Amino acid sequence: MKKTIAIAAVVTAMFHSVNVNAADHTFSVGYAQTDIEGVNKNLTGLALKYRYEPGRLGLLVGLTGTTLNESTTATIVNNQVQINTFDRTYGSIHIGPTYRFNDMVSGYATLGYATYEAKRKSGDSVTSGFEDSNFAAGAGIELNLTQSLALNGGVEYSEHLINSTALTYTVGLGFRF
């Protein structure tokens, strides 16, 4: 009987330590929405995050990409209809520390690099456009819903062109392993 209890205790301890170590990593995929000052519609896209948290302190790396494709006008050139479009893209990469407040909640702050590009196209050719890059800063929280499931939300700020600000909001669902 004592051997059975001892074996059960050792197996339980091994299983528990594997679970604790297994939850050091979180990979999240989520929805991103960028609000750029002076643009009537929001850019929408994808946010990817990877978090490594071996203890109270950890590290987060994130990638964000959003786009907006607008058809503006149609013109007739040489008896063919050409659609004029305006394409906008925003992308960023950021990295920063995480801090675990308790078993369920951790927060993060990031610094990174963001680009914003806009192109006006007439048919298949680009008629005008611009691209601007700048530093970006962000912050957010991550909630561990279960041992293997996490929910995160955050905001990212960057400035582009002549005092035009970009705010990107993200919400994601992650798998802890």
Where are these regions (language model features)?
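Outer-membrane beta-barrel "beta-signal"
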Residues: 141-144, 150, 165-177
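Residues that define the transmembrane beta-barrel architecture of outer-membrane proteins
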Residues: 23, 42-46, 87-91, 131-137, ...
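Residue-level signature of outer-membrane beta-barrel architecture
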Residues: 52-54, 97-99, 141-143, 157-159, ...
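Transmembrane beta-barrel strands of outer-membrane/channel proteins
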Residues: 27-33, 61-67, 97, 109-113, ...
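Flexible, solvent-exposed loop segments that connect beta-strands
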Residues: 33-40, 65-89, 115-133, 161-164
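Repeated loop/turn-to-beta-strand initiation elements of outer-membrane beta-barrel proteins
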Residues: 25-27, 56-61, 104-107, 143-153
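Short glycine/proline- and aromatic-enriched beta-strand/turn motifs that initiate or cap beta-hairpins
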Residues: 19-75
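Cleavable N-terminal export/targeting peptides
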Residues: 1-26
